[in-house]
């Protein structure tokens, strides 16, 4: 390299930082969870019409399914532009009770929903990237960061469920090393159960 020669900087490709979430990221995590649930009817049934506020409170709390403690975010120029949240499937009942405690307080009821995960897998619950930052590889980076953290904490399998009617999301997960292991019904939707196994 020629001394003092300036490096080429692609100003069209912003620098993306992948980092553990902080409590102040709770609102961004709430948007991720809302987008993952997707269906507004399901959101209202789950946590009421003021669902973003309720999900933000859940994300700010400790010991809930969507706690900031379980999330990893993508940051660009000081703004969170994507996040992934998940937890040890063996802790579903414990974390769901923490989540339901907020729902009882805010909404006055809790939903009757099936278990989305179980012991034996680290569950990737929700993933989203802001529309204007999609197709930059951020989703893949978040998935891999989540999997690496899970594997470093002793997980052998990372699991998730994806709507059978969302082939684009499914293709993303399959491209990142996930494979089909079964099907489940969740929020009245047929879901494909995928897992990625820790490399030997």
Protein language model features and the residues they cover:
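Conserved acetyl-CoA-binding loop-helix of GNAT-fold acetyltransferases
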Residues: 135-149, 171-175
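Conserved N-terminal entry element of GNAT/NAT acetyltransferase domains
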Residues: 1-24, 44, 198-200
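Conserved acyl-donor/pantetheine-binding loop and adjacent beta-alpha core of acyl/acetyltransferases
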Residues: 88-126
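Conserved beta-strand in the GNAT
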Residues: 73, 79-88, 123, 128
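Conserved GNAT-fold acetyl-CoA-binding loop/helix
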Residues: 37-60, 69, 96, 103-106
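A short helix-loop-beta-strand connector motif used in the catalytic cores of GNAT acetyltransferases and
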Residues: 60-73, 90-94, 123
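Conserved beta-strand-loop-alpha-helix junction that forms the acyl-donor binding cleft
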Residues: 125-134, 160-169, 185-191, 196-197
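Conserved GNAT acetyl-CoA-binding A-motif
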Residues: 121-122, 150-161
